[in-house]
Amino acid sequence: MFDRVPLYPGRVKMTPVSGQANIYDMERADKPTQAGTPLNKTTLLKDSTAALYGLTDATPDDVFVLLKRYSEANMPAGTGTLVITTVDSSGNAVGGIDVKIFRGSSVIKTVRTEEDGCIFVSLSAGNYTLSIEESVFYEISSVSVPAEVVSRGFRFINMVVSPILTGEVRFTQSTAFTVPAFVKKLKVFAVGGGGSGAASSGRNNNAPCITGASGGYTITKEISVPGEKCTITIGAGGPAIDITSSYYNGKDGGDTKLVSEKGVTVLAGRGLGGFAIDNSAYQYGAGPSGGSGGGSGAYENDEAAGGSDGGDAAKTGGTGSYRYGYGQGTTTRYFGDTNGELFSGGGGGYANGPGGNGGGTAGVYGSEYSSDAICLDATTYGAGGGAAKTYTAGKRAKSGAGYQGLLAIKWGY
């Protein structure tokens, strides 16, 4: 409820009643900046509320007496009830807010307010602290509120939150959130984790064929999940392959996804690790496909650039025959916007093939085939790592690691 806030306290306007001496109509003329909550049956005690307690023609005091008797009869000694209500700055109920209840420094319970913004919590008598953590969809005014619970009594606490009607958030770690009722639509953009490049050390005669990794797939999708809890999983980037002998495929990245509690799903698939193919016949080796394709490699000094913006990988030098990793065929830009930030470049194939946008460049084995081959890691979300190859046994071949995925949401757009 709100107090009346007058600009001119106590001012009234008196108007003579026509034909009636010394009789006046009187009205307020205080020009309130806040009209306040009127005092009537609707705001004090509705008949429907009284009926819940088996009362008719009741006053508010009748209900309070009944509540006290109920608490004494039904609450064990040493236990009280905390009544938490979450409201906006105008006093309107805001439901679906998670409130943590602390005793000392420990969280003893997390509760969620109902649609009417209220929740009843039974607790042992004592001192508590209530906290609403930072929220995606709300600005939190009541960050930390003390509350004392008394034996067989009620403690009423209002906590203030302000809805953010239009917003955009990026998630780079797995998490969960609840979509409030006022958010009718979400636009989701997801990027899968990029794979890592393949690596080879000590294998001569151009065998095996070593390729860069593909970038993670991307997806933009609109969903409607008001009131649902959504769980986000961010796909990891594939870890680098770091060896001094033999040859190994790169590691796949991880899927990035959003799943609502009713099963609505947005999934961006992982980028694949680069391929290490025992290829003594000097044939081409295909790079892996993904959001953007990974570069292939087959011959000494041949190069294959990783793909960008959902495209296939491309040959940039050398003399061999190639089949490249294919891209998804649609843009990998942020929310699919023409000028949006670019993600999910493919990794380069050896010898020094460049990566796609943010994809790792391939490692160079150097003059006389005697150098370590150290590849650059991917540097943008969802990008694949480059391949690494050295011909000398005992030399280090380290492929490029893939970069983790990303998920972003927009609402109120």
Where are the regions a protein language model picked out?
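A short, amphipathic beta-strand motif
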Residues: 80-88
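Low-complexity, glycine/proline-biased repetitive segments and flexible coils/loops
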Residues: 187-413
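Structured interaction patches on ligand/partner-binding surfaces of diverse proteins
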Residues: 135-163
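Extracellular "spike/adhesin" assembly and maturation modules
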Residues: 1-69
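A short, solvent-exposed beta-strand micro-motif common in secreted/extracellular proteins
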Residues: 125-136, 230-234
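Short, ordered, surface-exposed loop/turn motifs in non-cytosolic proteins
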Residues: 89-104
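Short, surface-exposed beta-strand/beta-hairpin micro-motifs centered on an aromatic residue
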Residues: 116-123, 217
